[in-house]
């Protein structure tokens, strides 16, 4: 792959619009997997996705020009899947399976277009919503977050001269490579790039992916970014997200349906996918509630992704549950992905080594760690805790409780209803990083 001089490209930026999203494949792989399932089973569900800035002290509307934001969103609106991309999706092998995408779904995808957006501003923040069929509005999540993250990076870099930009990227590359050197010391570690949504920029994410490829070889298992997977001949990785149980739960009509909702999602998923895609995401309404009510067949799945519990405590709780179900944890897989930095990766690796199969989905700390890299003192390169979550399904409010109460999403009345139903056991508040 040709390696561009990122600093020079940033400094020589004279074109009218430099698109942040150049392809609908510039998204996380699990979006395509989920949308295929939604297309097949829930085609008539309408949802709203909303931008939520959890870094409340950062006034996004002051940092990012509204006209630039609209121009980038409008550009994404006009994108379509190309013939080359459709051929690749149809012919490539994903998770060891050919034709993971059904021909009818791919035919539908050929004409796919993102739905319109709704953008306003209030008190220094952007209010951004995406309404429409679940199949369509879901696909806005990753591009929207990537656009806002990169626009904020660009705004910060506009203030830097050519030499300062050189120093910035030289330091960031050295910082990244020092992490790679530490990963090399962890035998047989499995790590992948999960950093699309809050990346510094697309070019920087691509450089980080190339650095991991070069630095740790087969220990780098792939990327969640579909476009980068296609362009760099890597595995496209990803399973499923909180939006599935959030929407299914919002659509329920009684307590019995609500109790079954997290497991209905898994049954739906298993109609489409198997093997290493059978990964349980247990924390949408609290991991403890999920494990307490889980049918025995859930223990037969390949693994879990403990997303919001502290890694050591969350992993140990799932290992304990597997043992209670008569399963050998050494044959199971834990995927750690919540706000990982290099210290957390090392600590988690050493703790669970030999106890369970492990994989790490490395996100913002991989693709947007510029802290201390600028010669000029500034906080504008600090990564945001920014999410785009489903907030309504068919007009009903959606809720995410999480194992970390700081990550709870929903209106207060509905949150309390879910807490009363699922319980508050083992939910521990901790500061949100990214």
Curated annotation (Swiss-Prot):
Describe the PTM. Answer: Transiently phosphorylated on a His residue during the reaction cycle. Phosphorylation strongly increases the affinity for substrates and increases the rate of nicotinate D-ribonucleotide production. Dephosphorylation regenerates the low-affinity form of the enzyme, leading to product release.
Q: What protein is this chain from?
A: Nicotinate phosphoribosyltransferase
State the Gene Ontology terms under molecular function. Answer: nicotinate phosphoribosyltransferase activity
Quickly give the catalysed reaction: nicotinate + 5-phospho-alpha-D-ribose 1-diphosphate + ATP + H2O = nicotinate beta-D-ribonucleotide + ADP + phosphate + diphosphate
Classification via SUPFAM superfamilies: Nicotinate/Quinolinate PRTase C-terminal domain-like (SSF51690), Nicotinate/Quinolinate PRTase N-terminal domain-like (SSF54675)
- Keywords, sorted A to Z: Ligase, Phosphoprotein, Pyridine nucleotide biosynthesis
Q: Does the keyword Ligase apply?
A: yes
């Amino acid at each position: 792959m040709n390696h561009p001089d990122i600093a020079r490209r940033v400094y020589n930026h004279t074109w009218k619009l430099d698109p942040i999203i150049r392809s609908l494949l510039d998204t996380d792989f699990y979006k395509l997997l989920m949308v295929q399932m939604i297309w097949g089973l829930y085609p008539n569900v309408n949802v709203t996705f909303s931008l939520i800035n959890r870094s409340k002290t950062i006034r996004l509307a002051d940092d990012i020009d509204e006209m630039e934001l609209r121009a980038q969103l409008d550009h994404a609106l006009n994108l379509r899947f190309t013939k080359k991309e459709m051929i690749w999706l149809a012919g490539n092998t994903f998770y060891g399976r050919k034709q993971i995408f059904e021909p009818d779904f791919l035919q539908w995808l050929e004409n796919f277009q993102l739905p319109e957006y709704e953008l306003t501003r209030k008190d220094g923040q952007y209010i951004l919503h995406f309404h429409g069929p679940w199949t369509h509005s879901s696909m806005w999540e990753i591009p929207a977050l990537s656009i806002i993250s990169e626009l904020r990076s660009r705004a910060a870099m506009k203030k830097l001269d050519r030499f300062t930009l050189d120093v910035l990227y030289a330091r960031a590359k050295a910082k990244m490579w020092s992490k790679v050197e530490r990963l090399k010391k962890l035998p047989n570690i499995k790590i992948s790039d999960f950093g699309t949504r809050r990346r510094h920029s697309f070019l920087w994410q691509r450089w980080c992916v190339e650095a991991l490829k070069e630095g740790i070889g087969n220990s780098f298992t792939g990327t969640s970014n579909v476009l980068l997977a296609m362009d760099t001949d890597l595995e496209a990785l990803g399973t499923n997200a909180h939006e599935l149980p959030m929407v299914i739960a919002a659509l329920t009509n009684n307590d019995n349906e609500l109790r079954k909702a997290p497991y209905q999602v898994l049954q739906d998923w298993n109609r489409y996918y198997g093997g290493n895609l059978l990964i349980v995401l247990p924390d949408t309404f609290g991991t403890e509630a999920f494990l307490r009510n889980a049918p025995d067949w859930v223990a037969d799945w390949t693994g879990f992704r403990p997303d919001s519990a502290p890694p050591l405590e969350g992993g140990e709780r799932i290992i304990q549950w597997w043992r209670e179900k008569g399963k050998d944890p050494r044959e199971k897989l834990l995927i750690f992905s919540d706000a990982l930095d290099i210290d957390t990766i090392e600590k988690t690796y050493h703790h669970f080594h030999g106890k369970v199969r492990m994989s790490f989905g490395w996100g913002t700390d991989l693709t947007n760690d510029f802290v201390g890299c600028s010669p000029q003192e500034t906080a504008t390169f600090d990564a945001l805790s920014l999410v785009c979550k489903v907030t309504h399904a068919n007009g009903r409010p959606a809720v995410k409780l999480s194992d970390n109460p700081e990550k709870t999403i929903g209106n207060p009345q509905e949150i309390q209803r879910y807490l009363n139903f699922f319980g508050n056991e083992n939910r521990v508040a901790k500061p949100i990083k990214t």
